[in-house]
Each structure stands twice: as C-alpha cells, then as structure tokens.
Amino acid sequence: MSKILILDFGSQYTNVLAKKIRLLSVFCEVLPWNTPLEDILQESPSGLIFSGGPHSVYQENSPKVDREIYNANIPILGVCYGMQLIARDFGSEVRGGENEFGYTPIVFYPGKLFQGLVDKDAFHTEIRMSHCDSVTVPPKDFFITASSQHCPVAAIEYPEKKLFGLQFHPEVSDSQGIGDTILSNFVKHICRASETWKIETIEKQLIQRIKEQVGEKERVLLGLSGGVDSSVLAVLLHNALGDRLSCVFVDTGLLRKNEVEEVKQQFLSLGLEIIVEDASETFFYELSGIQDPEQKRKIIGSTFIEVFDKVSKNLEVQWLAQGTIYSDVIESAKSCDATQVIKSHHNVGGLPEKLNLKLLEPLRFLFKDEVRALGKVLGLPEVFISRHPFPGPGLGVRVLGEIRKEYVEIVKHADSIFIEELKKANLYDKVSQAFAVFLPVKSVAVKGDCRHYGYTIALRAVESSDFMTACWSPLSREFLNRCSSRIINEIPEVSRVVYDISDKPPATIEWE
C-alpha cells in the first residue's frame, strides 16, 4: 500500500496535513522527527513531508534529520520549518527577519508543485503565512517558485533530487483550493502514490488486525460511552470477535441527561447487551476538592481504568478496548518532543502502570470523520454517527474547578435545554459540537422583582471538519435569546448565560 510519511517537527497543524493527504485516498502516517533513517526506509514510503515546527534551524539544539535521507531517492516536501531545514542542509542561510502572519499576497511561478495553478508566467493570490524565519537565498541547484513582499524565497524546488519546499502551510491556507492542489500534485504526480486508502478497505484491515492481535480464546472488555467512537468500535469488535466481546457502560455520574437509559436502548437495538456499572459515588469521592483541570482528567482516567479492572475480574477478559482516535493521541502528547502537551485525554493519559489488561485501540490512527465513515460502512444508524462528540471525562471538564453533584446537575440540565433547542431549530447537524459549561462564579440578577445571586452558564457551539481546528458557530441572536431565557427560567440556580466566541486555536474546544 502506498503511504506518505510525515516527520513531525512540532507543528500544531501536522495532523491536519495528514488528514488532507488521506482525503486524497492515500495513507499517511505521522512519525517523530528523530525516527531512525533505517526505520523510515523499512516503511518504503512513496514520499516524505517535513512538517513545520516552533524551532529555528540555526539554534544549536534544533531538530535535524540524517542527511543521508536526501540520497534515498524519495520525494521530500518541506513545510515552513521543514523547508528551512532542507535549505540549511543544502548550504543556504536561514535567519530571523520580518514576520509574516495571516493572509499575505504571494506570487507563484511555474513549478511541479503548482501545476494547474500557474499556466505560463505567474499566478498572483493570497496565502496564509505564519513564520518568523526565512530562507535568504535558495540553495545551489534549487530555484524559487513563490515569493511574497517580505519573503522572497517562499517556495523552492530541486526537481532532479525531488526536493520541494513551502514557507507556508498548504493544509491550512486553502481559501481557493490552492493548498489541496499543491498537496495533490506532490502526492499523486510527484510521489505517484496510488489511491489505496478507502474506508471499505480499512474496515477489512481493522477486523483482520483485531483477529490477529486477540488470541482465539481471549476475550475483550469494551467501555461504552454512547458516543460515535465507542459505538463504531463496539460494532467493529462484535463483527471481529462475536460473543468474545463484553461491553460495559460505566455511570460516572458525569454523563448527559438520560444518558444511561439511552445507551442501553441504543445497543440493545444493535443486538449488543451491555453491563451497566454505577460508579458515580466513587468518581465524586475521588474528585472531591480537586480544581486543577489536568489533575481532574488524570483522576477520571485512572478511576475509569480501576473500575474496569474490577469489572474485568468477574468477566475473565484479557483485553481492554478503548475508542481512542488520532486527535486524542495528538492532544495528549504530540508525536514528537518538539511540542507541548495541550491536555491529557482520559483514554491515553493517566493509565496506571499496574493495569491488569492489555490495551486494544483499533481506531487510534483514524480521524473523527474517518470513524464516522467507517460507522456508515458498518451499518450504524444515523443517530449514532451524527451524534456530537462527548469528552471521555464527561461533564467533569464542563464544570470548571471543583466538581460537585449540584454543579453537575445544573450543567446537565442546561446542556439538555441547549441541545433540545438546536434540534428544534434544525441546527444540531449544522454545528459540529455544542454544549454547556458551568462557571463557578455568581453574579447579580433580578428575578420576580427580587435580587438574585446565581451561577453562570456558558454555551459553546463550534464548526469543524477535523476538530484539530474549529470556528465558533454564529448562532442567531433570536436563537441564543431563546436558549438563555429557558435556562435562566428553568434552572433556579442560574442567573446569567454567556456565549463563547473563541476559535481553536487559540482556545481548545472544551474549556478544560
């Protein structure tokens, strides 16, 4: 199978880039920048991409590659830091100069990367720039294929060596299909990668992999959340293992309104019986007095595993399956040490070393949209596939600060009102994710001519294709007013409702 490998130097957009390539029906995998050359060559990649990153190539301890990689006859595309690295390795100078951020006028010249964009002489457009360093002059044998006012060397090519560089990010600069065209030219025309990454093929490969990984007499325990990921995984595992799968739904006390009963009914309709384990008191006890969001996530994660470990002893299982997907892995610990951890995900962070079960994560290299597509192939009802994502820690990360039962009940009620109104207005499927957040701050209001001192609820709705980046959803004033009025009137403890208008980045989708 053809594949493109991305060496990750720490860009926050590396995995957006991987998803863009997979959308071309070509498999793409992200590896740490310091992956040994021998391991890279064993993968037999059709092409390599050096990602962007936060470092400067002229820094003493900046990430570097084995220069023998340039003699492997593998097409290489450097993006931002990746281009600067190629330029430096071939003798050019990189220095800090005038910064360029945001949409910038740029000129493209004829080149293999720009086929279909530049017919004869030049193509003028705007592209999103985000860099502090620049290549001063192209290395020997390279020629310039793009320039901007403050970055004369905005793209370079050395066709004979199949080396290419872009100072901008094609994966996030696509306002007119430009980035998609550039990536398609590299992947399909320069690397000549075949289109073998198709969801029907993925289903068969995953089932085969599960059968190979799990012994013939071994059993698997799956924790259900009712969300897209665990629902798809449940059906996938059932198809692969049959009755050797045991599904357990843990009631953490941090779930949405009526979640337990809804999940039971959903899976019974699919022919899957589930065991419900009420561990809510345990979770509230362990979280008592804890305010730090990272600590809360890790406590929820470790408690979750302990509950599963206890249940597993009565079921004689050897494997614990989790619906971890690529974005969970990315946000918990980027695939290289050049970036910082944004937040731990309960599926992959805080796992105790004494875990008594082997870990099975069949979906960990699939993006959310790929999981949804897999669900359709598996025949899941639309109600499963179109459901908004729900964080593993549940409402534990939607109650800011200390988690108390009364706070959870308030946000649970507010969230159900918000979702109900979205569905009534036919907006639920038009936003990617929507929820309410409890803020442990009180403000003054007037209810029934009396002074009222109540809590604040924040509403958040975002639009995103991959959840690596997201834009806040511009819901109408009339709609938000309706939601606010219902929440304040129906929940006595609440006196104020606000709407979150923060994009990701800089904000994350969840507040904690």
Swiss-Prot record:
Which Gene3D superfamilies does the entry mention? 3.30.300.10, 3.40.50.880, HUPs (3.40.50.620)
Disulphide bridges in this chain? none
Where does the signal peptide begin and end?
none
Catalysed reaction(s) here are: XMP + L-glutamine + ATP + H2O = GMP + L-glutamate + AMP + diphosphate + 2 H(+)
Domain GMPS ATP-PPase: start-end pairs: 197-387
What cellular-component terms does GO give this entry?
cytosol
Q: Where is the Glutamine amidotransferase type-1 domain?
A: 3-196
Give the positions the UniProt entry annotates as the active site: 80, 169, 171
Question: What is an example of a GO molecular function annotated in this UniProt entry?
Answer: GMP synthase activity
Q: What pathway is it annotated to?
A: Purine metabolism; GMP biosynthesis; GMP from XMP (L-Gln route): step 1/1
Its keywords, alphabetically, are: ATP-binding, Glutamine amidotransferase, GMP biosynthesis, Ligase, Nucleotide-binding, Purine biosynthesis
Q: Where are the transmembrane segments?
A: none
- Ligand binding (ATP): 225-231
The record's Pfam families line, in alphabetical order, gives: GATase, GMP_synt_C, NAD_synthase
E.C. code: 6.3.5.2
Q: Which purpose does this protein serve, as stated in its record?
A: Catalyzes the synthesis of GMP from XMP.
Q: Oligomeric state and partners?
A: Homodimer.
Which protein are we looking at? Answer: GMP synthase [glutamine-hydrolyzing]
Could you tell me the gene encoding this protein? guaA
